[in-house]
Amino acid sequence: MKFFIDTANVDEIKKANDMGVICGVTTNPSLIAKEGRDFKKTIEEITTIVDGPISGEVKATTVKAEDMIAEAREIAKIHKNMVVKIPMTVEGLKAVKVLSKEGIKTNVTLIFSANQALLAARAGATYVSPFIGRLDDISMDGLELIRTISEIFATHAIETEIISASVRHPIHVTECALAGADIATVPYSVIEQMTKHPLTDQGIEKFKKDYEAVFGK
């Protein structure tokens, strides 16, 4: 399973990229707004840091297929690695069909059911993004959704990749890998948590003390 980082914070992207663990970035209107920066300038800077798929979403106010298509074409011009995030709606599917034929990569977002994922894949989506944390929030099983989509795609040889989104903690990451997700897009805070274990800290401290006992500080 591959890792993308889910943020528009350039400093976080740099830190994660320096670890050598991420191969892409996902953003959304909320993440861009949180940074208080211009969308295009932010995306352009991100493309100079990570050489991999960069998802930029059409505006939340864009609801008609023709408008999504026009906006997606502009986003795709920013860089060769751009992937356009399109919401899972009827109009969104219409846009994905056209964009796919034009060779523009798409990431259909806000997926909450296997049927939605299947429709998006058949429309030509490069990626689908099921939101597991938000399903967990309403007492549904987000990870079961990943398993179901993965099984359907494998059964029918569907090449659309599954991006596990709304990942809240390291256990989500492990379970997504087991469930068959191709990619997990995670916040920087989760990446940090994944690097840590109390026994690792204890082991490092013991090695340090043992060394200092013999050789001094």
UniProtKB/Swiss-Prot annotation:
Read off the PANTHER family from this record: TRANSALDOLASE (PTHR10683:SF36)
To which species is this protein native? Brachyspira hyodysenteriae (strain ATCC 49526 / WA1)
Q: Where is it chiefly localized? A: cytoplasm
Its biological purpose: Transaldolase is important for the balance of metabolites in the pentose-phosphate pathway.
Write the protein's name.
Answer: Probable transaldolase
Q: Which UniProt keywords are present, listed alphabetically?
A: Cytoplasm, Pentose shunt, Schiff base, Transferase
InterPro entries, sorted:
Aldolase_TIM (IPR013785), TAL/FSA (IPR001585), Transaldolase_3B (IPR022999), Transaldolase_3B/F6P_aldolase (IPR004731), Transaldolase_AS (IPR018225), TSA/FSA_arc/bac (IPR033919)
Q: Which reaction does it catalyse?
A: D-sedoheptulose 7-phosphate + D-glyceraldehyde 3-phosphate = D-erythrose 4-phosphate + beta-D-fructose 6-phosphate
Metabolic or biological pathway = Carbohydrate degradation; pentose phosphate pathway; D-glyceraldehyde 3-phosphate and beta-D-fructose 6-phosphate from D-ribose 5-phosphate and D-xylulose 5-phosphate (non-oxidative stage): step 2/3
